[in-house]
């Protein structure tokens, strides 16, 4: 298939309208079969539950062109499972996980001309989402919902390579101990906007959120999980019931152990011990791994030995191995890559 006439090398990380998107509706207690449509507009009632009470969830994933020319997605079954968990928490109907994966495949296939070529550094970002579409005036779950999948080609998250970033320990809380921090709900991200705008105004790239109960333990940023590397090369990631279970983080921990032979540990990480780590990174779909060079905790600077010039050596190996798997340069574990045919 011929690709669209897009300057892939200079593609930004933003929205580009593509040819098709998938739409399914939940009404009278059941989902319809769903269809592909060319219409990118969503028309809903002014009193829709999504507008009144933020009843909406989403996922983020990518489709890639591999070294041998295949179009693949990365572990969509895990996105389907997490999406179902998010729906249950917000009292929304679960979109069947098998149909979720099929909708992803169908939408990517319909927009194959927008999947950037191998070696361009660009990918096709895939955004499944669901929202309450029927009117609600009292505080209660809606009765009707819409599930959609949109795609948009995006350039690399970091132009010219991933340079270490500087983050601050935030005075804001991202999630309550028994709240919604473990799901991918739109309301979580809306709550983080003021904090990230404030951080940017102060010259920082991101926020480090601590646990709301004690403010002593590391949780995550507004949209990425933390990974740390000890001075003896152990890969550590924070454990908390209010952290979003990142698919990228889960994959990185597997790669660290099974591909690189490193010791891994998921545990509570206290802010007081962060200064003792050798490397730090943020992991998520957008950038895979973003290296962190410095954390500022209310005037105290924590500078990692890996520095501000480039990724630390272990972080770099993790990044290169995982992206190698995603792009087909390194053999993937069974089921990780789903080919779009």
Predicted regions: what they are:
Residues 117-127, 131:
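Extended, Lys/Arg-enriched charged tracts that mediate electrostatic binding to polyanionic substrates
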């Amino acid at each position: 298939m011929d690709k669209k006439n897009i300057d892939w090398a200079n593609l930004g990380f933003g929205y580009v309208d593509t040819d098709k998107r998938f739409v399914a509706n939940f009404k009278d207690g059941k989902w319809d079969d769903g269809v592909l449509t060319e219409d990118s507009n969503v028309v809903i009632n002014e009193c829709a539950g999504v507008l009144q009470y933020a009843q909406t969830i989403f996922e983020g994933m990518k489709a890639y062109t591999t070294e041998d020319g295949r179009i693949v997605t990365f572990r969509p079954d895990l996105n389907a499972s997490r999406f179902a968990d998010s729906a249950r928490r917000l009292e929304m109907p679960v979109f069947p996980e098998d149909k979720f994966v099929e909708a992803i495949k169908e939408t990517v296939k319909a927009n194959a001309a927008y999947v950037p070529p191998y070696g361009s550094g660009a990918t096709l970002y895939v955004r499944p989402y669901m929202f309450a579409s029927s009117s609600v005036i009292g505080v209660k779950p809606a009765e009707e919902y819409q599930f959609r999948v949109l795609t948009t080609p995006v350039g690399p998250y970091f132009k010219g390579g991933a340079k270490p970033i500087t983050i601050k320990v935030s005075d804001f809380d991202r999630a309550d101990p028994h709240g919604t921090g473990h799901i991918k709900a739109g309301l979580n991200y809306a709550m983080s906007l003021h904090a990230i705008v404030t951080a940017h105004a102060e010259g920082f790239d991101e926020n480090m959120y601590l646990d709301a109960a004690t403010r002593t333990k590391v949780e995550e940023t507004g949209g990425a999980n933390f990974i740390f590397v000890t001075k003896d090369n152990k890969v550590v990631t924070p454990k908390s019931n209010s952290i979003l279970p990142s698919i990228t983080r889960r994959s990185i921990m597997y790669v660290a152990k099974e591909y690189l032979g490193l010791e891994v540990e998921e545990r509570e990480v206290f802010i007081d011990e962060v200064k003792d780590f050798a490397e730090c990174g943020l992991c998520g779909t957008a950038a895979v791994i973003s290296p962190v060079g410095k954390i500022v905790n209310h005037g105290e600077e924590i500078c990692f030995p890996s520095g501000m010039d480039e990724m630390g050596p272990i972080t770099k190996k993790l990044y290169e191995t995982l992206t190698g798997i995603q792009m087909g340069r390194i053999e993937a574990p069974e089921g990780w890559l789903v080919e779009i045919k």
